[in-house]
Regions:
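Gram-negative bacterial Sec-dependent N-terminal signal peptides
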Residues: 2-19
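Inhibitory N-terminal propeptides of secreted protease zymogens
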Residues: 19-100, 149, 295
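Structural recognition of the beta-strand scaffold that forms the well-ordered cores
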Residues: 24, 56, 81, 152-155, ...
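C-terminal subdomain of the subtilisin-like protease fold in secreted/lumenal serine endopeptidases
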Residues: 45-46, 280, 289-300, 307-312, ...
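Mature extracellular/periplasmic domains of secretome proteins
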Residues: 142-148, 253-259, 275-297, 306-324, ...
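Subtilisin-like peptidase catalytic core
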Residues: 151, 158, 171-173, 177-304, ...
Length: 483
């Protein structure tokens, strides 16, 4: 059976705020009705009901600044901010980023690939044995420690292909915040004919020897000599309005690759065109924290701090949930959120030669760790596989790694993760550096953590072993000053 493999370059970032009349209001339960009535607001939906109530509200006034000033001056209000619209673009054009890794090796690995058993499912060998896993010494770590992951990783993204053969055994029920309904299937964004065509192995939308780019905006980034571009005549399967379809499934596949016995909770806060609202992301964080998530993986960022987002982050941290966020693809030393919030593990992208990816944001204010983010092969809807570039695909490596730590040290708190994973390959301006799972996890187990793998014999222990030891790996002398 032939399966298509695609190249994907993406990270969630915020669009500039436009004039709007929707806001996120936070007030105590005893004051919220008074605030709404006093300022002529209309409640659209409740985002969270706890010590404070968080509401999505609207105002009939088009004067955004005036409404903000008026409501924020009310002493009964905890916070008040405009709703933000977010999107899932390709690598940010502001950096004119170029990829340092040739796609030739990726293409070569797709030809004549074999199928292998991986913890109860059959997957392509180039998924379990690839450059990214070799760099972080995943296979060596798994062999030495028998750690395969525990707990639940909630992924806030575009959903997931709940029927993907590699993922069905580890997915737990999620929620679709874009439709306000249980379940988080990415295929719900497709019309039935398109969904059926995607899952056909003989659809013939491309030659099996080619690798695709889903969005023409990436043409300037990817090498023309090694990349097949999606022909416009084939867009009846996945048209341009669905440019970010598959992103959530790709993130889920990376978590599963690192931590194959951890469970995954897909939370759909983004549409297939990459659009979302800040209110849905806030709801998703609260939902994850209240519904058993051990880790929340967030491959998105916004450029301005948000009181509502920060409150949701703090709530999750208070419930001992580990939060991981992509650092952004602007190629800048800048702050983005939630990666720059205290307690959040901000993840940058590194290359196959252990340098900072050209597109990755950097600096101690936004990056706690780096992980490979170029040419990472992972799952894609329809039982397919794809290769991705971007900090979107670095973040889930750390999310998976966090569950390995939790398996060895079940009582670990969010801050402990930083310490236990800090035996790294140092990279300038990339926090503690590029994660080294063998160095960190063997140190963890040997220092007294108990390892009790739930699935030591349930499948291949692949995730490639490095053929050379990383002599420069080791704890950094002083970590980053993360805000």
């Amino acid at each position: 059976m032939r399966k298509r493999t695609l190249l994907f370059v993406a990270l969630l970032t915020a669009l500039p705020l436009a004039a709007q009349s929707s806001y996120i209001l936070t007030a105590s339960p005893s004051n919220v009705q008074s605030v709404v009535d006093s300022h002529g607001l209309t409640v659209v939906k409740e985002l969270f009901d706890g010590t404070n109530c968080v509401m999505l509200v609207t105002s009939p006034s088009a004067n955004v600044t005036g409404v903000e000033t008026e409501v924020e001056s009310d002493l009964k209000v905890v916070s008040f901010e405009p709703q933000q619209n977010l999107s899932l673009p390709e690598l940010n054009g502001a950096t004119q980023a170029t990829l340092t890794q040739s796609t030739t090796g990726i293409l070569d690995s797709l030809v004549g690939r074999t199928l292998v058993n991986f913890f109860g499912s059959t997957v392509p060998s180039n998924y379990t044995t690839q450059t990214a896993t070799s760099i972080i010494r995943l296979g060596d770590a798994r062999t030495a420690t028998n750690l395969t992951g525990t707990g639940v990783v909630a992924i806030i993204d575009t959903g997931a292909d709940i029927n993907h053969p590699a993922l069905t055994g580890v997915l737990v029920p999620g929620y679709d915040f874009t439709r306000d309904t249980p379940g988080a299937s990415e295929l719900a964004d497709l019309n039935p004919a398109m969904a059926a065509a995607l899952q056909q192995s003989t659809t013939g939308i491309l030659d099996a020897q080619n690798t695709l780019v889903l969005n023409a905006a990436a043409v300037a980034i990817l090498s023309q000599s090694t990349t097949g571009i999606l022909d416009q005549s084939t867009t009846g399967i996945l048209d341009s309005t669905l440019s970010e379809f598959g992103h959530g499934t790709m993130v889920a596949g990376i978590v599963h690759l690192i931590a194959p016995t951890a469970k995954i909770m897909p939370l759909k806060a983004f549409h297939a065109d990459g659009s979302s609202d800040l209110s849905d992301i806030i709801r998703a964080i609260y939902y994850a924290a209240d519904n058993g998530a051990s880790v929340i993986s967030m491959s998105f960022s916004i450029s301005q701090p948000s009181p509502g987002l920060q409150a949701a982050v703090q709530y999750a941290l208070s419930k001992n949930v580990i939060l991981v966020a992509a650092s952004g693809n602007d190629g800048l030393k800048t702050l983005v959120y939630p990666a720059s919030y205290g307690g959040v593990q901000g993840i940058g992208s590194s290359t196959s030669s252990d340098t900072k990816s050209n597109f990755s944001n950097f600096g101690s204010g936004v990056v706690t760790f780096a992980a490979p983010g170029e040419g990472v092969i992972t799952t894609y809807p329809g039982g397919n596989y794809a290769a991705g570039w971007g900090t979107s695909f670095s973040a889930p490596m750390l999310s998976g790694a966090a569950t390995l730590v939790l398996q060895a040290r079940p009582l670990s708190r969010p801050g402990d993760i930083t310490n236990w994973l800090s035996k790294t390959k140092q990279i300038s301006d990339m926090g503690y550096g590029r994660i080294d799972l063998f160095a960190s996890l063997t140190n963890l187990v040997n220092s007294g953590g108990s390892s009790s793998s739930t699935s030591s014999t349930s499948g291949s222990t692949s995730g490639s072993s490095s053929t050379t030891t990383n002599s420069t790996s080791g704890s950094t002398s002083g970590g980053p000053s993360h805000p």
